[in-house]
Structures are given as structure tokens and as C-alpha cells.
Amino acid sequence: MGKIIGIDLGTTNSCVAVLDGGKARVLENAEGDRTTPSIIAYTDDETIVGSPAKRQAVTNPTNTFFAIKRLIGRRFKDDEVQRDVNIMPFKIIAADNGDAWVESRGNKMAPPQVSAEILKKMKKTAEDFLGEEVTEAVITVPAYFNDSQRQATKDAGRIAGLDVKRIINEPTAAALAYGIDKKQGDNIVAVYDLGGGTFDISIIEIDSNDGDQTFEVLATNGDTHLGGEDFDNRLINYLADEFKKEQGLDLRKDPLAMQRLKEAAEKAKIELSSTNHTEVNLPYITADATGPKHLVIKITRAKLESLVEDLILRTLEPLKVALADADLSVTDINEVILVGGQTRMPKVQEAVTNFFGKEPRKDVNPDEAVAVGAAIQAGVLSGDVKDVLLLDVTPLSLGIETMGSVMTKLIEKNTTIPTKAQQVFSTADDNQSAVTIHVLQGERKQASANKSLGQFNLDGIEPAQRGQPQIEVMFDIDADGILHVSATDKKTGKKQNITIKASSGLSEEEVAQMVRDAEAHADEDKKFEELVQSRNQADGLVHATKKQVEEAGDALPSEDKEKIQAAMDAVDTAIKGNDKEAIEKATQELIEASAKLMEIAQAKSQAQGGDNADAGKQANATADDVVDAEFEEVKDDKK
């Protein structure tokens, strides 16, 4: 059985870890980094992921996708999506089913399809380290992700060629990473997770007793559209406004300028965590009839803090709700853990310290803790980690729409999962032969104010007066937090059950097609790699042959020279094309045309060998007169 890997699929950065010798190990990617930017770029002939994609973003802004996690499992008309439509340099579109998709070079793509490219890179990173194929993974999601977003994340895993063994909440994973070595006593931990695109707070009780550990989530809350990207956008808008005041030009209309501005804003934000002021300097940011324009704006830490103050305050309300749901006060919290890159901001740390009345722990890496926790959970599933029990919760209440457009809850938020619940309902009209089960997720009483997860019909109900038929509705949430629903007519025993797919979401056929596309691209990538290899070999041979022709000089007959030159020209022409077989054929013909050249080179080499042999005999003749001397090797440090 192969290893199950742990993946933190982040909004800004992603990370992969595996259990190695009983310990979770964060793996370095091909670029030598422990985290990979969650950025994907599409060019004419390839898909680029991570740091290389980030580097080319300025020149390819409309086909470079970042923060895709903010779109996953969302509808195009959602307010959160509409906010992003106006500020993202790439195109966000409405799919046929109403989902938010993206478009690149005329191709429409679902967010899980794009996210799968990041997961593929994580998979490859793990395979390079382990030296074997990886097919199974534990993937993390924000605790406050709804059913649609969890389903979409699992779809992304499937498209990437991974069997997702478990979806685990990010704060829970961070608590696992923190608590796995704490062997005795009880701790109540608050995990404050402010990442690139999402915010979560989870209150978790860690019970360690005689080697057995239980991680029980008491409550969770959050905002799936609040994170570092929003902090960046505040700074981007400020810089764009200041530039417009000075120059009268709106940079928001120029995608290339906005991409440069985004990179500069992110860099300035990071710098202001360790310094009190910085300068954003972008020469030639744009131009008008009077010539090129340069952006030079000084920013202080205080200015940045004033721009994002309300965002930081927005994170405090979920803290209060989570504590109330767990029936705890701030004094009951033993430790506070910060997760997510945005928690490096001093103002965020100050707000958390003031709220809880204690300093957060500094021994948890905010960028890596979630992946480490995912790897530990992978170890639990594979049996490599024993005596650890993880009890997670569903973040939002689940129920159905009943008469009067009311949401009737079957499972309350913060219920430990997996769990089941059932309730008996009846008909609203006389002789009603079918009922529609409309499944909802949320906390509002009015059905339409909650998230619709889907609906299905139970028909064949025997005619009867309203209120007489008994319809039992069963909700079953699995360990991934994904819902399965059934409805049964208790009189006839007729049953209808479904795994809830969002009223939008990808169909089974769409996911299967995307999996096939990904496999086809894997073949394409392999062929492309082989083509490049053939080109490089052919190019190297031409270079070496030219050199040998020059060295041979007049010893090479002009007839052979012409034949070799024609063969080299043929190779050069073949290299410019995309036909691997044509390149290899031209390469072989050059080798054959160079036969005479090889003979000359070998003869020259043998002649030099003879000269060296004579020199060796002379040296041996005087060897008896030579006295051995002690010597000390002197190493040349300049090498």
C-alpha cells in the first residue's frame, strides 16, 4: 500500500507533507521551496504552476489564475464572486449551470479543474521524494466551507488523479500539528486561521491521557471570503487612487499595470510587518500622450493598518460566536495558535492578543502547520499513527424546507461528525402523491436565505388526507462533512436517496471528462518533454559536428563537407518543427554523413596517443634518477 499524503490546498500558497520515520515532513518542490504559490498560468503550449507561473504573471495577466479557491463551489451571482469579478485581471464567467468559472484563451474552465493543476504539482513533489506513485491524499479545507465547496475540492482531487481519503478542516489540522507531541493533560486551544482567502476560528479540546489523544472540535466559525487577498486589494485600491489623483490616469483599466501593482502591494504589505515604512516604486507603470508615467508612493505601517482595520475587526465577531457555541469564555482558552500567512501582520497579532488576553504561541509555523496536520491524519487513516482520535464538526446547520418556506433543521451546527439524524414529515395537501425534499445549509429561519444544496422528489405516495402520510427524512454526514440524504414513505417503504450534489456543481460526467482530459494532458506533457529532449540532443550534435569540421580543416574532403553541411541544415530545419520522428531521422542522417569526419578524428586521436607513448618511454628511462619528495597538496580556493 502506497503512502497517503497530506495537502494544504491554500488560496495563496499550497504545501504537501508526508509521514517519514513516524514524523510529518514538509516536502520541497522542484524549485526547492517548501510552499508553492497557488498560481496557474496557461500559455500557447503548456500549463505552468507555482513560482514559474508567478514570475510570468506580469506579461500574461489574463491567463494567469490566482486565488481560485475563492471561486470553488460558488455561484457566479454570489456577492463574494461579484466583488472579485471587478478586480481580478482574469475573466470570471457564469457557467451554464450558474457556477463561477474562469476563461483562458477561449477555454472555459471550472475552478476544480484549475485547482487540480496545483494538486498535480503537490502529487509530483511527493512522488519525487518517495520514489513511487502516489494515488491517495488527505486534503484540507477551511472549516467554514459548505457542502458545495467540499464536494468541489474532492472533485479537484479526482481530476488530479488522487483518491481523496479524507477532507479535513484546516484549523483542526493545525491543532493536530501542534498537539501531537503534547502527551499529558487537557488543553483547550483556539486556532485563529487567517489565510490568503479565508478566515476560520475553531475551539478544540485536546485530551492526552496515557498515550491516547483525542482532538475534539467544540465549535467553529468563520468567513470563507476574508483573507490576505482582501488586505492586498485594500492596498492596491489605495495605490491606484493615489496615482489617479497625481496623474489623472486610472490603472484599473490596464490589466498589465494592475498585475504589477498587485505584486508590489503584496511585497509592501509583507515588508510592513517588519518595518515601519516602505516605498512602492514602479517605473513606466503606464503612459499617455505626454509620455511614460512612474508610480512612486511611500506607505507607512500606520497607513496600511488604517486601510485594513475593519477587516481585522471582522475576524473578531466569529471568535465571539465560536466561544458562545462552545459555551466557553476567553479565560477557558489555554493556548492560542495562529495559522495562515496573514497572521504575521503585527496588527492582527495585537488584535488576537487583546481579545484572548494572552500571547499566541510562536512555535507553530503558520505556513506549514496545516499540511503537517493533514499528513498526521493521513497516518491515522493508513494505521501508521495510532492512539489518535479526531472528532470534527459540521460548521453549518443542515435541514429541509417545510411549509411556509421555513428551514427546519435536522442537524445543528457544530455537531460532531460523522452523524445521522432523522425526522418524520407529512404532506401539505390532500391526495398529494409526491413531495419535494429541498435540502438547505445555514442558520436562517427563512429557507431562501440559506444555501440550497439540492433537491429531489419522492413520488408514489398513496393518496390520503394532508398530514396523514409519514415521510421519514434521514440526514447522514460522513467524516468529510459531505451530506447523504434519504426520504422514505413509511407506509409503502418506497425510498429515494442521494448524495447531495449542489444544485450547481460538476456532474459525474463532467468530472470524469476532466479526469480524462488531465490524463490526456499528462501524455501530451510527456510527449512534449521527449520532443524537447530530441531537440536538445540534435542541437548538441550540430554544435559538436561544426566544431569537428573546423578542427579537421583540409583533411576533410570538400564533398564530405558539403554532405555534412546539408545534413546539419536538415537538422536545423527539423528542430524548428514539432515532429519528434523527423528530428530523430535528421539526427541519424547527420551521424551517417559524418562517418568520414569520425575516421579523421579517430586517426588524429591515435596519432596523439603514439606521441604520448614515446614521451612516456623517455620519462621511464630517467625514472631511476628521480628522488621521491614529500609534498603537501595545496587546494585552490578560487575554484
Swiss-Prot record:
The keyword Electron transport does not apply. Residues 625-639 have a biased composition (Acidic residues). Keywords: ATP-binding, Chaperone, Nucleotide-binding, Phosphoprotein, Stress response. Residues 602-639 are annotated as: Disordered. It comes from the Bacteria. The modification Phosphothreonine is found at residue 198. Signal peptide: none annotated. Induction: By stress conditions e.g. heat shock. The keyword Magnesium does not apply. One of its GO terms (molecular function) is ATP binding. Coiled coil: none annotated. Acts as a chaperone. Belongs to the heat shock protein 70 family. PANTHER family: HEAT SHOCK PROTEIN 70KDA. This is Chaperone protein DnaK. It comes from Shewanella baltica (strain OS155 / ATCC BAA-1091).
